[in-house]
Amino acid sequence: MLKRLLKRPSLNLLAWLLLAAFYISICLNIAFFKQVLQALPLDSLHNVLVFLSMPVVAFSVINIVLTLSSFLWLNRPLACLFILVGAAAQYFIMTYGIVIDRSMIANIIDTTPAESYALMTPQMLLTLGFSGVLAALIACWIKIKPATSRLRSVLFRGANILVSVLLILLVAALFYKDYASLFRNNKELVKSLSPSNSIVASWSWYSHQRLANLPLVRIGEDAHRNPLMQNEKRKNLTILIVGETSRAENFSLNGYPRETNPRLAKDNVVYFPNTASCGTATAVSVPCMFSDMPREHYKEELAQHQEGVLDIIQRAGINVLWNDNDGGCKGACDRVPHQNVTALNLPDQCINGECYDEVLFHGLEEYINNLQGDGVIVLHTIGSHRPTYYNRYPPQFRKFTPTCDTNEIQTCTKEQLVNTYDNTLVYVDYIVDKAINLLKEHQDKFTTSLVYLSDHGESLGENGIYLHGLPYAIAPDSQKQVPMLLWLSEDYQKRYQVDQNCLQKQAQTQHYSQDNLFSTLLGLTGVETKYYQAADDILQTCRRVSE
């Protein structure tokens, strides 16, 4: 009995190819077909036929690819690859509403082990285990009967390819205009079609990475200090805090009814309520905000081998330090002193390879005390990073309850999810306030200033979308509108004639973006170069005396 159960089932090659093609193209593309139904109403027989033709085309394409690969005995490994990739893509698309594109592949490559662990849920393991791993094992377990005639096998496979090609041509002849209109008006649809979405996105990522090995492009080689800032005995110290996954609409400084920024509300900061990010993922936004390229003309491949604003500031003679608690600076700090404080794994501050952002202050007091000359310190926070929001803040910051204390955020109620996310912002408020107080403690030695700017926002289940990383053109504002604030010591305002009342009024009426960071940092630190654009410097119009 057991022997009979364990006996390998057998199929002829053609049947195996058809079965594998059906599973990959139909069963692993449920997410794609669901999205098609949202864009294509089945309100007429014609639209019904257009929709029904799509599985036919998907099946035919995969059938052709697998059949061609069988001539090289690659049909099993290729089918297994398609199954594993398709199962993973479908899970993340259906669970989090993501899009598989180059940015998402970059996110996957940049994901730390701790972040990967945080994404692992029982649902994920079961889904990928059954639809991916088990299906791939079954594809390998099924025995393919040897062909009785090699010529007959070749002819059958050739006929199989021909029929698939004819089906594709028939659909094209009948519905080409419908397909062209549907995919032209819904360009992101194709990014849900597996396994082509993962293959195209991976190739695009590889092409961009290959260009990153080009020689370094130097910019701002004319950089020098403004004499007004260089000739004073009192030195200048600026802290830039790069936020992670903080969305503007949940900042109480932005008008959010909940008090998520109780400390910053008392710090006399200038908050900029209309600030847009450069991208919807860290891998895009961080290198973009430190580059001299505006979002509309931003080129990822160039940013990977071109200097940024920190290089220019350092070249002008300012000490630069980057403290990282978010898995790396994505190239923005490659040529300045930097350290991964997460790796310190400090007790009471770190959990499963991730740390609370307070770890960023470890050794910072000593660094400032020993600092000779002007300085810029960048603190790269983990902020509200997905999806284990409840691990981003210590227990004492659990202000809003009940919370979503799981990485299966889609299983939590809206109230639980928002409560947990808002608690991360209460902790962000604490971190930024702590940095301001640190600067205040050193005002006897330095003229101080601080900038906080988040890399991108976050979706919390609105319209079935979670996390971030959607293509910019279709991403909701919750992923693109980010908090930005500026704190200037009274000494800075007096010494460099900056009118804070002017800044407050300007902040409420003007629209800003991460494009402003490059020239604002140069102006804030008094670095002059031809790359500086006064129109992008937030402080420029509120300086009483021209520098």
Swiss-Prot record:
Subcellular location: Cell inner membrane
The organism's place on the tree of life at top rank: Bacteria
Membrane spanning stretches: 13-33, 48-68, 80-100, 124-144, 155-175
GO terms of molecular function: phosphotransferase activity, phosphate group as acceptor
Disruption phenotype: Decreased amounts of the 1-O-P-PEtN form of lipid A.
Gene Ontology biological process: lipopolysaccharide core region biosynthetic process
An example Gene Ontology CC term for this record: plasma membrane
Top-rank EC class of the record's enzyme: transferase
Keywords for the protein's UniProt record, in alphabetical order: Cell inner membrane, Cell membrane, Membrane, Transferase, Transmembrane, Transmembrane helix
SUPFAM superfamilies in alphabetical order: Alkaline phosphatase-like
InterPro entries in the record: Alkaline_phosphatase_core_sf (IPR017850), EptA-like_N (IPR012549), PEA_transferase (IPR040423), Sulfatase_N (IPR000917)
EC number: 2.7.-.-
Role according to the record: There are several lipid A forms in this strain, including a phosphoethanolamine (1-O-P-pEtN) form; overexpression of this gene leads to higher levels of the 1-O-P-pEtN form of lipid A.
PANTHER family: INNER MEMBRANE PROTEIN, PHOSPHOETHANOLAMINE TRANSFERASE EPTA
Family membership: Belongs to the phosphoethanolamine transferase family. EptA subfamily.
Protein name: Phosphoethanolamine transferase EptA
